[in-house]
């Protein structure tokens, strides 16, 4: 069911938006219910500097802080309006920050882990590849990249996934897509991760009405140069 994993930390994260504009509050509450962010959060390291790419209104970044006080989190998004809402949810500026940035063109700062949640499908496949490569530049060898995404499948749940995104984009809650989305197949997604320099495993999200998965990637060691 939607929101199968719930947590007190997620409730606290949502509560941070109590003074946000009504539309933003509505979206945040809907996202908290539908996206099962608590399931994704458990795969993120409990401490260190975490960069959340395409953070939107910042709900997942807030959850990361609420769930583990030893995390320092930076959320980056191109939408200035969403970043303004996200900054309104910040109480602990030393540990949680939001910045306007282009995750396709700009390399994120060096960090201990990168997260990307429900973002890549809005980008053409070549831009998805660029985002993954940018994430790789921010990580040391073995550094984790945690990505929640939706897969293209011959599955009734994929029709539900696609229809919901048409609604959210049409209502203006999500930017990008322009009524076209870029959901890769499992094989295509794995190939993109590998091409960006990651080794990756896939975690199925249980009891979901959508084709959601979590890609658990780690930056692969550099291959030694062949002997002359």
Language-model region placement:
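Conserved beta-strand/loop positions that form the S-adenosyl-L-methionine
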Residues: 53
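A conserved beta-strand element that flanks and buttresses the S-adenosyl-L-methionine
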Residues: 115
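Helix-capping/helix-break motifs at membrane-protein junctions
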Residues: 124-125
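Class I (Rossmann-like) S-adenosyl-L-methionine-dependent methyltransferase catalytic domain
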Residues: 1-49, 57-107, 146-228
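Alpha/beta-hydrolase fold active-site loops
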Residues: 111
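Short catalytic micro-motifs in class I SAM-dependent methyltransferases
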Residues: 118-119
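A short glycine-rich, Lys/Arg-flanked "PGG" loop and its adjoining helix->strand segment in the class I
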Residues: 129-141
């Amino acid at each position: 069911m939607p929101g199968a994993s719930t947590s007190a930390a997620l409730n606290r994260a949502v509560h941070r938006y109590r003074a946000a504009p009504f539309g933003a509050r509505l979206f945040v509450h809907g996202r908290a219910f539908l996206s099962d962010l608590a399931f994704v959060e458990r795969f993120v390291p409990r401490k260190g500097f975490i960069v959340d790419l395409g953070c939107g209104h910042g709900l997942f970044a807030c959850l990361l802080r609420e769930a583990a006080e030893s995390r320092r989190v930076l959320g980056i998004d191109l939408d200035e309006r969403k970043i303004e809402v996200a900054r309104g949810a910040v109480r602990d500026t030393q540990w949680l920050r939001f910045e306007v940035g282009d995750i396709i063109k700009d390399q994120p700062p060096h960090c201990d882990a990168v997260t990307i949640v429900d973002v890549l499908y809005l980008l053409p496949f070549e831009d998805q590849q660029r985002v993954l490569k940018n994430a790789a530049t921010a990580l040391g060898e073995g550094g984790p990249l945690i990505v929640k995404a939706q897969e293209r499948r011959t599955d009734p749940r994929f029709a539900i996934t696609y229809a919901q995104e048409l609604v959210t984009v049409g209502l203006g809650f999500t930017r990008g897509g322009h009524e076209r989305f870029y959901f890769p197949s499992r094989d295509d997604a794995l190939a993109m991760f590998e091409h960006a320099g990651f080794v990756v495993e896939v975690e199925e999200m249980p009891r979901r009405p959508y084709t959601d998965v979590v890609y658990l990637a780690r930056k692969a060691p550099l291959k030694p140069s062949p002997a002359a």
